[in-house]
Amino acid sequence: MRKLALFILTLVSLVAISCERDPWLEGPVSLKPSTDTLWFDTLFTQKPGSPYPISVTKIISIRNPENAWVKADFELAGGNASAFRINVDGVAGPSIQGIEIAPRDSVFVFVQCSLEPNNNTQPAIVLDSILARVGGRESRVILSAWGWDAHYVQDSILPCNTRWSLTDKPYVIVGDVLVRQGCTFTIDPGVQIYASARTVLYVLGQLNWQGTPGAPIRIRGDIPSYKTDSLPNQWGGIYLLRNSGNSILKHCDIRNANLGIRVDSLPIAGGYNLRMENTRVSYCGQACVAGVNAKIEAINCLFSDAGSYTFLGLLGGQYNLTHCTLADNGRIGARQKGHFALTNCLRDGLGRVVSTEPLQCSMTNCIVEGPQWEELQFDADAGVPFNLNFGFNLIRTRNEGGYLPASNHIFNQDPLFEAPLAGIYRLQAGSPAIDKGSTTTSISQDLTGFTRTAPNDLGCYEYR
């Protein structure tokens, strides 16, 4: 019994000793950051009176290289006035004291920034540093961000006949915007627009957006970085509501939306709901362009790279496409069906037709290309018209149902785009689309303003 008690006492002593923390290292220690500079992409400066926008949160680790515990202090060199914010192991503030770091272990530092207006028309750099100290020795991580002033529009019903003409700084839309019925929203050449994640532009009136080849109108998500150029679902999109009409988009570049442009219902007074010329709509989560019993004309347009559809004509409508390229590289979504779709009916979840409307679609001198064997989807109810007038197109299709005459189309040949995986759909030398266009069209320039020569090339780009 005495031996057992002695054994237990010895065991408890060993456990107690093993649980004791190694002694603190009091002398100077050079902590090891995972990077010497933390870069933030361009960030819009703050809207006056608002915390918007705030950057994404970036993370760095700072390692204790020693075989002993240390206590580290962290500080922003800019103090309370810094544009940056830090959080170390759950403790936030411009100055954080006594953070314990185990031997050969690391702590994580979370960094955000929000930038004050700088009164510049171009992005201006903002710098600060994180200082990490142990025993008087300092390690430094430089923080760098570019701040860009903007004209802000937030949750607005636009005044009738609003015109955006300023090109000194971009416009940033935060929340939804509405164009009232009977009003026109005009945008001048060269205007840049960035839309937040919860932005949808609703249109009861009409749009008059007319850029030029050298000064297109651009609208995209509100993270101005080349890394996000081709990412979908950064904002909602443009929604032309029922009874809107006669909207026109020329030389526009619309990207990064969930649904690029949705158009509802035939216009009351004739004409088109939407006419697009020399316009690009790309990198959309659902569809680039979707018409619901709408009337849409597109000339020299590029609709590319969407989760489901580059073009959708749903429940009838009238659609006229000339010299358009509709292409998908398969990098957005995992669709199993064609990205160009037309239907004169609407079905319920059991596949039963619940509504029908006549459909008429003309397509001339266009390209429809993608990674599927069949890039067309047609759903035609025999009870109402489903009229197609297709000619002189290059299409990836099995032509099931025999909707397209084989005599004046090119089926299932590689159009030889320059770099489709990078979203570049210009034609290369030797493309079967070169000089194959109908001579009856009178389109004198391509999407970029380059002069077309007879016979024209198919698609939105003339080979040069």
Where are these regions (language model features)?
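Sec-dependent N-terminal signal peptides
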Residues: 6-9
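Beta-strand/loop edge motif enriched in small/polar residues
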Residues: 20-25, 31-59, 89-422, 432-447, ...
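C-terminal motif of bacterial Sec signal peptides marking the signal peptidase cleavage site
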Residues: 15-18
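Short acidic, flexible loop segments centered on an aromatic residue
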Residues: 64-83
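Short, solvent-exposed loop/linker segments at beta-strand-coil boundaries, enriched for Pro/Gly
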Residues: 77-95
